[in-house]
């Protein structure tokens, strides 16, 4: 019940934050003299696919990056941090790629293969390497 109320209140706050009010009380003089209040305020774009004015760049004045690639880079940096922390933890617990694969119950996902490459590099050099997200060919 608390979760439902919390969701309803947060949704209401979010919707109220995204709206603009031109006037709370309208007088008949304003509405009869060709009021432009309906067209004076632009609607805010609520999704990244619809941009009312132009494409916006979060980090740069030039618009060389599109909005989708900026949003993807946030996910990539979070994935880099999470996977690097996971690999370091596994390495400190002295878990080999075979034991990691056994813990994953034999599933051969990308983490098992990448951990093997990362683990081999860490064993060969003696330093902890950084794992970097590599975009699959379907995205490029």
From Swiss-Prot:
Reported function: Effector that is involved in host plant infection. Contributes to virulence during the early infection stage, by inhibiting plant defense responses induced by both PAMP-triggered immunity (PTI) and effector-triggered immunity (ETI).
UniProt remark on domains: The RxLR-dEER motif acts to carry the protein into the host cell cytoplasm through binding to cell surface phosphatidylinositol-3-phosphate.
Short motif RxLR-dEER, span: 56-72
Family, as annotated: Belongs to the RxLR effector family.
Keywords: Secreted, Signal, Virulence
Gene expressing this chain: CRE2
Cellular component terms per the entry's GO annotation: extracellular region; host cell
Signal peptide limits: 1-24
Induction of the gene: Expression is induced during host plant infection.
Compartment(s) of residence: Secreted; Host cell
Official protein name in the record: RxLR effector protein CRE2
Disulfide bonds: none
Species per Swiss-Prot/TrEMBL record: Phytophthora infestans (strain T30-4)
């Amino acid at each position: 019940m608390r979760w439902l109320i919390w969701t309803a209140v947060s949704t209401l706050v979010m919707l109220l934050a995204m709206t603009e009010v031109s006037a709370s009380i309208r007088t008949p003089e304003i509405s009869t003299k060709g009021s432009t209040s309906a067209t004076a305020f632009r609607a805010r774009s609520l999704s990244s696919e619809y941009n009312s004015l132009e494409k916006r760049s979060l980090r740069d004045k030039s618009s060389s990056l599109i909005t989708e690639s900026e949003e993807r880079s946030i996910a990539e940096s979070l994935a880099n941090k999470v996977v690097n922390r996971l690999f370091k933890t596994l390495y400190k617990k002295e878990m080999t790629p075979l034991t990691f694969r056994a813990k994953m119950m034999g599933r051969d996902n990308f983490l098992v293969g990448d951990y093997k490459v990362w683990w081999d590099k860490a064993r060969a050099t003696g330093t902890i390497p950084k794992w970097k997200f590599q975009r699959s060919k379907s995205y490029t």
